[in-house]
């Protein structure tokens, strides 16, 4: 299989072909996802909750991300691999570049950062140094203490700010954007306005791609289950069939449905 590239995702957007992505944290699942046709994977700081058992993503370190990135890369050598820069890993441009280098050397093709227009200079600095960047707007889990919990973002007056943040990130050189827990109407406005691919999670079926935390997709998340999550394993019966069903429902626009969306 040829390596999956950012250019391929750009082509998907231009041709209006939806694509499925998912989080991965180890060799075995990365290989399974790649074998079944998910060719874009994220080593997310969500591992702090799903793998390490913390109540937020905040304790995750750059070293944690690098460790799991190496494992995922071994399992999916041709996948486009995104890696989160975790909490406080990009407080200054110098720190950001050093930490981005760590996860890129571990096997990432792109780093993902949470934040809006205030990150533009950092995104521009990375892009100028050949580090591809994926932005992340809406519900940004590293800011959970500021938001007062895991809540829908971008409603009311905040919608225009978030829209302008998206434009600023693209202008600064971001090549992908994740939108999390925002109203469908805002997600469509942003997706239509940007030339770069937009990946949604809790943003309706109007984005170019979708992403799920793998534990949510298989119904093994403990405690609160997000509204946007769907247990594909319950319907499919086995993990490989669940992955194929997830891909098919994303590509056809069946998932996410109205019951998984916000307004």
UniProtKB/Swiss-Prot annotation:
GO biological process, one term: pantothenate biosynthetic process
Binding site for Mg(2+): 45, 84, 114
GO function terms (MF aspect): 3-methyl-2-oxobutanoate hydroxymethyltransferase activity; magnesium ion binding
Active-site residue numbers: 180 (proton acceptor)
Main EC class the enzyme belongs to: transferase
Keywords associated with the record: Cytoplasm, Magnesium, Metal-binding, Pantothenate biosynthesis, Transferase
The enzyme's E.C. designation: 2.1.2.11
UniProt-annotated location(s): Cytoplasm
Pfam families, alphabetized: Pantoate_transf
Binding-site residues for 3-methyl-2-oxobutanoate, renumbered to this chain: 45-46, 84, 112
Cofactor notes: Binds 1 Mg(2+) ion per subunit.
Any one annotated GO CC term: cytoplasm
Catalyses which reaction(s): 3-methyl-2-oxobutanoate + (6R)-5,10-methylene-5,6,7,8-tetrahydrofolate + H2O = 2-dehydropantoate + (6S)-5,6,7,8-tetrahydrofolate
Cofactor field: Mg(2+)
Assigned protein family: Belongs to the PanB family.
Function per UniProt: Catalyzes the reversible reaction in which hydroxymethyl group from 5,10-methylenetetrahydrofolate is transferred onto alpha-ketoisovalerate to form ketopantoate.
PANTHER family hit by this protein: 3-METHYL-2-OXOBUTANOATE HYDROXYMETHYLTRANSFERASE
HAMAP family attached to this UniProt entry: PanB
Full protein name: 3-methyl-2-oxobutanoate hydroxymethyltransferase
């Amino acid at each position: 299989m040829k390596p999956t590239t950012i250019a391929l995702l750009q082509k998907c957007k231009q041709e209006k072909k939806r694509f499925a992505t998912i989080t991965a944290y180890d060799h075995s699942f990365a290989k399974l996802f790649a074998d079944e046709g998910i060719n874009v994977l994220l080593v997310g700081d969500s591992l702090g909750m799903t793998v390490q058992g913390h109540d937020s993503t905040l304790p995750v370190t750059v070293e944690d991300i690098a460790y799991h990135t190496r494992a995922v890369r071994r399992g999916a050598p041709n996948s486009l691999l995104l890696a989160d820069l975790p909490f406080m890993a990009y407080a200054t441009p110098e720190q950001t570049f050093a930490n981005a280098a760590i996860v890129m050397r571990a096997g990432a093709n792109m780093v993902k950062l949470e934040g809006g227009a205030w990150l533009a200079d950092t995104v521009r600095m990375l892009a100028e140094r050949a580090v591809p960047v994926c932005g992340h707007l809406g519900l940004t889990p590293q800011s959970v203490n500021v938001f007062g919990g895991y809540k829908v973002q971008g409603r009311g007056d905040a919608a225009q700010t978030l829209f302008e943040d998206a434009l600023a990130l693209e202008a600064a050189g971001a090549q992908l954007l994740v939108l999390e827990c925002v109203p469908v109407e805002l997600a469509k406005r942003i997706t239509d306005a940007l030339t770069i691919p937009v990946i949604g999670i809790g943003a309706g079926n109007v984005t170019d791609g979708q992403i799920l935390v793998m534990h949510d997709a298989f119904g093994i998340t403990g405690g609160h289950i997000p509204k946007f999550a769907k247990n594909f394993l319950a319907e499919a019966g086995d993990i490989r069939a669940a992955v194929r069903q997830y891909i098919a429902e994303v590509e056809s626009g069946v998932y996410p449905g109205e019951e998984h969306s916000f307004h």
